[in-house]
């Protein structure tokens, strides 16, 4: 049961990342490559000037990718803290004499709750990332 919820959560995150890549990141990659190509077409520029030009072209994309990575890490850390809390509660219950089957059921219920709570965070995280990527693409 908990595994099913974990898979649903993973699929939702994967879907969000694919959507961000398709709708936002890919467009930024295209701009970056076109911008970089223009840098290379400047026959009057030195090698160093071309290099700096290409770096400037790459900056918005690098910032966008970093933003997505940071937000996903935050989400993962938050989920990990939630499941660690479940594990701690289960250990405490077991140490206080609860039966193993009861502790397993409590742990599973708690992990399912974590997954459901984090599923509910995905739409707002998606909106936040899409808004930030749209801003970075200006």
Curated annotation (Swiss-Prot):
Transmembrane segments: none annotated. It comes from the Eukaryota. InterPro entries: DUF842_euk. It holds the Pfam family DUF842. GO terms for cellular component: cytoplasm. Signal peptide: none annotated. Belongs to the FAM136 family. PANTHER family: PROTEIN FAM136A. This is Protein FAM136A. It comes from Xenopus laevis.
